[in-house]
């Protein structure tokens, strides 16, 4: 018979223990040495969240200590890639903290690849650094477990509790154990919502069995949005959705393949297809965001959404599926080894396919 369990006198409750929640717990302990910190996670903290099965790159690292980039550079890049739909203050605030976070991960034992000549972190693109990330989440989870007074695994937080005495103030949260059905009540002075985003808002090309293997994490059910909106929180940047190009039967990330291994895409006829759609896209969005004549001179990236638009347009024109060509890169045994490691560290099924 399910029972009710009450956890009282919490100073800081962290709802969700993916990479964001684990980091929040560590920071909470750093700044609040004597506070009671509790984590509630709907899976198991060691392998939960978007990087649960590993990740082979950290996709944002300034490299300020190596003289590579500054936070201002990243704001300009993101503003371009997202076609102006950004909060620059939030971007800058994230960018100025990201390097110290990466250095912290390395101190905890995360293996980060280095350039053997320069000694700097190995880049796969301007912003991405390459890691051996199959144990990414367990490493960060260990720091969170040491920081928290209690960790409740298998607890799905469903609602935030509002304070009757103070308007617009959260006083805790409730949820249930997904294994036993036990009802949990957490009474807390503050709640950090680090629950998942929302995957599968759009129907993926992956259907049937593949629907559960899409990337981003299929278990991201919109909890972070639902909890906050119902409690009356102000939401910002909600109009920005990350939509990533994925390829037939692969599902997983391809950043290292494009940026480091220099692979490229083609349609079902073996043709390069992106450039044929660029003139029409330039008319649609203007030369500020897509100038095929001057893009290489300004070093501006072509916005991701426009690349996606070209891919979707090509498929709709009957020339899909779109493939990623790996044969040329894999003529180099060293690059082939990197390709294998890349997928085995985060998307094993993709390594078998490609």
Language model region names:
Residues 1-9, 15-22, 44-62, 90, ...:
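Conserved N-terminal glycine/acidic-rich loop preference
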Residues 7-10, 179-190:
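Core beta-strand elements of the Rossmann-like FAD/NAD(P) dinucleotide-binding domain
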Residues 12-39:
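N-terminal Rossmann-like FAD-binding beta1-loop-alpha1 element of flavoenzymes
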Residues 16, 188-190, 194-195, 268:
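Short, well-ordered coil/turn residues at beta-beta hairpins
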Residues 43-76, 211, 253-257, 261:
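Conserved N-terminal glycine-rich FAD pyrophosphate-binding loop of Rossmann-like flavoproteins
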Residues 45, 63-111, 230-237:
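Conserved FAD-binding subdomain of flavin-dependent enzymes
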Residues 99, 106-159, 163-169, 239-354:
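Mobile, glycine/GP-rich and aromatic-enriched active-site lid/loop segments adjacent to catalytic centers
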